[in-house]
Curated annotation (Swiss-Prot):
Protein's recorded name: DENN domain-containing protein 11
Domain uDENN: 1-168
Organism: Xenopus laevis
Keywords tagged on the record: Guanine-nucleotide releasing factor
Location of region: Disordered: 1-29
A GO CC annotation given for this chain: cytoplasm
Length: 434
């Protein structure tokens, strides 16, 4: 069994823009080690620790407040000269005034952000009876943002109770900051890191990551997971709508991205890159309009009317598409039901193993990611084998061997061949024809 790490499952399989390696200390050791190593499983079953990536750093820290006169504003940030335009709306989702607290993942150019929001009743008439703030960070990579969750939750409460006291945030930034290269920022900034200082000035951070988010995702969508799986694998533009709180919906974005994991080399070279955008608002319309593939969530209902921005719209548990040729993919077929049953069987077996054997070395997140990764690899391995054969013909038997319904998944298979550039002939009898 692979050793568990404290790395978050939150999109741990993908990195954001590249990060420069950490400089070595005088003792020749990497600083900020001790977060636990990731592990790689070799074909023979041997576990080998992966190189420790030094990406536990930030590009900015900020405080956003709601001003009754001016609306959302950035009241404080470090560094002073970083472009935070739009962050005041990304870190305080539309409709947040209806909830007491929330957290939000988002993208800002080539950076990823995490912000914690809180809403506190006050007696001040100037503040109209409520004080609302968000405290957040930007990073070139989203894989370790979860580490800051507990700290940001504490700091937003601190800012509500003692506005204007930024000393812990100053110390946090000095410890975690990266230095942007001189010159115009590109969409993929490379950061160069400074050694940490002032660790004693801010509270120790608890490891907080979305444990259980996969289980909630499965329970929420049920068999429709396999509808989302097909759309994710086809690199469609998926937009998830939900009223606040939006944090749990950001995790649904993550789960959707995990559905499309493929580890076979050479797969996906012709397919558009699938990008997690997490929370988006109307200010992101122009950006989304230029994207060929993404998964995002929003609290703004107006997006539903802008059908040119998305292929798939998810409202609560209602998955729908206005694209006529994608309509057949909305139906859950017999093969989907079988896969869903197999997934649940594996979950039950895992829970039994944890209860009886005390197996704490595996978790449901690992099982979920591995289940879909193996399913996807199974499909593409079959397609690669057929592509290397002489007749290059994909039959109903091939479809069954891939865990697909030859007739119910015909449209899905045809689209899959086109998206991933497989020049194969699909020979599956149409059940509607004699």
């Amino acid at each position: 069994m692979a050793r568990r790490t404290d790395r978050a499952p939150l999109l741990d399989w993908a990195e954001g823009p590249g990060v420069s390696p950490a400089p070595e200390t005088e003792q020749g050791e990497r600083w900020a080690q001790g977060y636990g190593a990731a592990w790689e499983r070799r074909p023979a079953g041997e576990l080998t620790p992966l190189p420790q990536l030094e990406d536990d750093h930030i590009a900015a820290v900020f405080v956003v407040t709601f001003d009754p006169r001016s609306g959302n504003i950035v009241e404080w940030c470090r560094p002073h000269d970083i472009d935070l335009e739009g962050v005041e709306f990304k870190s305080m989702a539309s409709g947040s005034h209806r909830v007491q607290s929330d957290f939000i993942y988002f993208r800002k150019g080539g950076f990823f952000g995490l912000a914690c929001f809180a809403n506190m009743p006050v007696e001040s008439e100037l503040e109209r009876g409520a004080r609302m703030k968000s405290v957040g960070v930007l990073s070139p990579s989203y894989t370790l943002l979860y580490r800051y969750m507990h700290f940001l939750e504490n700091q937003v409460r601190h800012q509500l109770e003692i506005p204007g006291h930024y000393t812990p945030l100053e110390a946090f930034y000095e410890d975690k900051k990266g230095v942007l290269p001189v010159g115009p920022q590109t969409c993929q900034p490379a950061l160069h890191w400074l050694p940490p200082v002032h660790k004693h000035l801010y509270p120790e951070m608890k490891i907080t990551h979305p444990a259980g988010c996969m289980s909630q995702f499965i329970k929420f969508f049920g068999e429709q997971i396999f509808v989302l799986w097909k759309f994710a694998l086809l690199r469609k533009r998926i937009l998830i709508f939900s009223p606040p709180p939006v944090g749990v919906v950001c995790y649904r974005v993550y789960c959707c991205c995990c559905l499309a994991n493929v580890t076979l080399p050479g797969i996906g070279a012709t397919a558009p890159e699938s990008k997690p955008f997490f929370y988006v608002n109307v200010a992101d319309i122009q950006t989304l309009d230029g994207e060929g593939s993404y998964v995002a969530c929003t609290t703004e209902k107006i997006f539903e009317q802008k059908q040119d921005l998305y292929d798939v719209y998810v409202d609560n548990q209602n998955v729908k598409t206005h694209r006529e040729h994608l309509q057949p993919l909305l139906r859950v077929n017999s093969a989907d039901k079988e896969k869903y049953q197999r997934l649940n069987d594996q979950r039950q077996l895992l829970m039994y193993s944890q209860e009886v054997d005390g197996d704490c070395g595996s978790c449901e997140e690992d099982l979920f990611i591995l289940f879909f990764m193996e399913q996807n690899n199974r499909i593409f391995q079959t397609l690669l084998e057929v592509a290397s054969s002489q007749d290059k013909t994909l039959t109903a038997e091939h479809a069954r061997s891939m865990g697909l319904d030859p007739h119910g998944d015909r449209t899905f298979l045809m689209d899959l061949l086109e998206v991933y550039g497989f020049d194969l002939m699909l020979v599956i009898d149409n059940p509607c024809c004699p």
